[in-house]
């Protein structure tokens, strides 16, 4: 059975009140219409500038497990550097503030993800490839 797609602000607010977060943790189980997702992301994070990025990184660090998604080590002193975009902000600014477009990574694996030569060897690569296909499909 296909998941119910959240199309309205009321449905989004209802999910939040019930303890779900279709913007982040529950995004794949409770998908949102892309126009609504963009609108809410803009409201929460603002523009794709330094202030907006700071809000976005803080949100991700508050809503995602603070464990490297590649090696499983705990992120003891979380910072914006631990929030690694799957699709780069520069090449895909429309996805820069989509929490589905990030991994939480330790510094070593953040650097590895950014290098095409080491990216293919990473455990998160197959999952990220599926995410890339889904995000590109939704944002086109």
Q: What is the meaning of each model-derived region?
A:
Residues 97-113, 133-140:
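Short Fe-S-cluster ligation motifs
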Residues 72-102:
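Histidine-centered nuclease catalytic patch
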Residues 2-12, 16, 22-70, 94-96:
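Short, charged surface segments at domain edges that flank catalytic/cofactor-binding sites
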Residues 67, 82, 105:
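The −1 position to Zn-ligating cysteines in a subset of zinc-ribbon hairpins
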Residues 11, 109, 128-131:
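Single-residue recognition of alpha-helix capping/boundary positions
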């Amino acid at each position: 059975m296909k998941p119910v797609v959240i199309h309205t602000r009321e449905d989004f607010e209802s999910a939040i009140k019930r303890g779900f977060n279709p913007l982040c943790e529950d995004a794949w189980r409770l998908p949102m219409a892309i126009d609504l997702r963009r609108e809410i992301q803009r409201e929460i994070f603002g523009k794709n500038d330094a202030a907006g990025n700071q809000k976005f990184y803080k949100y991700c660090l508050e809503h995602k497990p603070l464990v490297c998604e590649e090696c499983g080590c705990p992120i003891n002193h979380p910072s914006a550097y631990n929030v690694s975009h799957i699709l780069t902000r520069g090449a895909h600014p429309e996805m820069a503030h989509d929490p589905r477009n990030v991994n939480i990574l330790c510094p070593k694996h953040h650097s590895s993800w950014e290098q095409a030569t080491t990216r293919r060897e990473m455990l998160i690569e197959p999952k990220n490839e599926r995410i890339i296909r889904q995000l590109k499909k939704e944002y086109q």
